Amino acid sequence: MLRDGNEGMSTIPGFSQIQFEGFCRFIDQGLTEELHKFPKIEDTDQEIEFQLFVETYQLVEPLIKERDAVYESLTYSSELYVPAGLIWKTGRDMQEQTVFIGNIPLMNSLGTSIVNGIYRIVINQILQSPGIYYRSELDHNGISVYTGTIISDWGGRSELEIDRKARIWARVSRKQKISILVLSSAMGSNLREILDNVCYPEIFLSFPNDKEKKKIGSRENAILEFYQQFACVGGDPVFSESLCKELQKKFFQQRCELGRIGRRNMNRRLNLDIPQNNTFLLPRDVLAAADHLIGMKFGMGTLDDMNHLKNKRIRSVADLLQDQFGLALVRLENAVRGTICGAIRHKLIPTPQNLVTSTPLTTTYESFFGLHPLSQVLDRTNPLTQIVHGRKSSYLGPGGLTGRTASFRIRDIHPSHYGRICPIDTSEGINVGLIGSLAIHARIGHWGSIESPFYEISERSKEVQMVYLSPSRDEYYMVAAGNSLALNWGIQEEQVVPARYRQEFLTIAWEQIHLRSIFPFQYFSIGASLIPFIEHNDANRALMSSNMQRQAVPLSRSEKCIVGTGLECQAALDSGVSAIAEHEGKIVYTDTDKIVLSGNGDTISIPLVMYQRSNKNTCMHQKPQVRRGKCIKKGQILADGAATVGGELALGKNVLVAYMPWEGYNSEDAVLISERLVYGDIYTSFHIRKYEIQTHVTSQGPERITNEIPHLEAHLLRNLDKNGIVMLGSWIETGDILVGKLTPQTAKESSYAPEDRLLRAILGIQVSTAKETCLKLPIGGRGRVIDVRWIQKKGGSSYNPEMIRVYISQKREIKVGDKVAGRHGNKGIISKILPRQDMPYLQDGTPVDMVFNPLGVPSRMNVGQIFECSLGLAGDLLDRHYRIAPFDERYEQEASRKLVFSELYSASKQTANPWVFEPECPGKSRIFDGRTGDPFEQPVIIGKSYILKLIHQVDDKIHGRSSGHYALVTQQPLRGRAKQGGQRVGEMEVWALEGFGVAHISQEMLTYKSDHIRARQEVLGTTIIGGTIPNPEDAPESFRLLVRELRSLALELNHFLVSEKNFQINRKEA
């Protein structure tokens, strides 16, 4: 936090800090906690004892670098070594060795892990916090029924409910419930202890009758009753130790372990003083919960809001990694026990290193990062996407909710989200409200809660102090909203300000305020904070904008925005795509692939990223920004990354736009653009595709990589080198061979060529045949080969020894069908590219670059794009850049409009262009039709907007099929571009054809053009000879499939075909 002249200001925390803190907490605390839980292992005769000495464990520095791990598809991990001892109790000897436990994947500087060469990230999960929660529901008679739900650390739930007679029941499943007295007795309390520990003993005494008193007379009877209700399948159980163990395993371990957080919550809610290390549910907890429930029945106490963030906890990367480490140690324990028993059985002398295997830990983490729903492949479309992905929070995942069962109340915005979870940034579709994004200043506290910073207002001290509050603490304070940040301190005593108190938004005097917000962006996520004039947009459009900025493609020539919010620099810095100087010094040498820095007597070579492919096929590239001989300081930018300029985020381009209709080409969100954007490479981007092939060892022999491929034209093999692999720099077209490969196979005698059969008969030479299994370039993949990698995994399986990867770069200009969007949810598809001379032009002759539909603004209520458009024009003419904080109306009324108009007026005066600011229609100007030169009827809003090109491109979506594969069951074309699928005539298409009465077209669409196998084959022959296509004589395959499916339901369907010649009904069997 800054002091003195900048008192009251703070720096924004690192956007990847949550991931770093979580991983450091796992390494510092989680590893040690789980290792301490590892038990001493003894054999059955208790002669050998194995134990780990966890105080001196070691994590070894990785043997490979991050770049090599990605290149060779390896895991960037550290080896874990722990001293272990094997004690022989008979001779009192101990053998101590350092054993290798396994590999733990490390986190890199981006806050991600590299597993099998793929960047993966673990996102935070929001779960219901363990503890007890009271709620009230109306029964069918309209009477309030009070229940208390106890949630364990594992997510198991048990309910306490009170009936009309004030009797309390414990419901351990949906169907079974038992008396609270039976449950307390089964947990170890007698009736006297129960009555001594409750506030309403007379109510508890009224529960049991004589039969129930017998059940709670002893602990054995209570356990039998509880077991019979909860776990018994049938018969009369008999009390035994095995019965107690089964009940302990089925019920108490799953539903009664509260954990560290649950114990804290239970103590706070029920005013208990049970020690924190006692993490299991005790009879005292149950009785206190029952007392509280009785108080609820009598109108005392408050109900709990299950959706309040104080009742939620964050399962961070530290918790998830610690859970997996504990699971791996349990597997290791079982493996060590089995190895000890096997060694003794075979009379072998074990050693610690022989007993411990690294497989459990390594395989557990590999399966976690590869299969767990919360471990996701890092989205690297652009720099913004990388940092936003690590700050996601999800209600989904193991132990959480599902998209189909979550209610609207859970998805909705809650007042406790203020400053913690962004109210705007969430996914669209079925997961809306379930996957959110953390606010900029939010952090995860020690107890798994989301904390938000506030400035404390103190009359005694003039110093401003920043405090982080959890959701349970800030309810007790009057918190002033962010608009009070700009008020003059001298007038504040007389001001009335909006504030938040106990989930309500009030307007109170300044002297009653306890805390105030620290930053106007405090409530928003990173994506929403990059939207200028966000306060003038509808929240739905702001949501779309924050999502679409993550889909922006890095352009070949990036340009920073004229109108921004000021967070562009921080976002680019924390994304890690720019090269930053770690030491001060002098630039000795600079090149496209490295920068050499000299300082303090050392020379450091800093490698740059060159044309690296992201997992969304976008191009990641670094461009040097320093010259040779220049002196730099620590933290200075050496090279810009993809979509950054001068260390600022630059996702799009500032283009001249007009809001007007144009011959219908921009109706319904279509966009008309100038050919200047194509020929000037304004929206040109590079995309890198990866194609790979593996060589296997088959039963007939190994596959061969070669350039001698029989039966293929030389034209297709023109780009292969002598090894059979495509050469670097080659231009590749669809269908060309990238890697030549032959797979050996045995052939039948009849399939041999005559000369091969002669060789076999005369000389006895075995002629080997091979099948061509080359890697060919698929449709739409044409481009330039920029990299070829031949990877041989060390110690790999002989069945998969080699892998060849070919990387092909495509240069894509903007074209009809591509999707573009602004930063205000204004998206559209390119409908037509006009010559620049036909585009509307301004009064100074400048042609417009894009034409948007003005009808897309009022109905969608995203007026922020108009402010940005006009201010961008003023900034372009004045050569200025603006950084606008949101909610600038806190300074004065209509502050945004006054700013825009004043800048337009300044631009009009300085450039001597009166059309820039016309008083009768400010922000609008008369423009001319490029085809005729005539002015349009009405003035039009023109300006400079920051427009993004999105990853939804027509080259990836357009698809056509002349012939292809058919589904085996229905005999209809497959579905989807990836399978070379086609269209099929469905139910609604048939209705459309029937509506026009086109009987013959309907027949051919449903028979030989679709799934009639025999008629489909006859079409080709009759077309070649020029005959007429015969009408099919039987039913198509889909109808036959319907008949068979009805038969499987024991329904026989007979059908009849009517002949055209004599209208005679002929019965046919399907």
Swiss-Prot record:
InterPro entries: DNA-dir_RNA_pol_bsu_ext_1_sf (IPR042107), DNA-dir_RNA_pol_su2 (IPR015712), DNA-dir_RNAP_su2_dom (IPR007120), DNA-dir_RNAP_su2_hyb_sf (IPR037033), RNA_pol_bsu_bac (IPR010243), RNA_pol_bsu_CS (IPR007121), RNA_pol_Rpb2_2 (IPR007642), RNA_pol_Rpb2_2_sf (IPR037034). It comes from the Eukaryota. Transmembrane segments: none annotated. Its main location: plastid. In plastids the minimal PEP RNA polymerase catalytic core is composed of four subunits: alpha, beta, beta', and beta''. When a (nuclear-encoded) sigma factor is associated with the core the holoenzyme is formed, which can initiate transcription. Belongs to the RNA polymerase beta chain family. Its EC number is 2.7.7.6. This is DNA-directed RNA polymerase subunit beta. It is an enzyme of class 2 (transferase). GO terms for biological process: DNA-templated transcription. HAMAP family: RNApol_bact_RpoB (MF_01321). The lineage of its organism: Eukaryota, Viridiplantae, Streptophyta, Embryophyta, Tracheophyta. It comes from Liriodendron tulipifera (Tuliptree). It is found in: Plastid, Chloroplast. It holds the Pfam family RNA_pol_Rpb2_7.
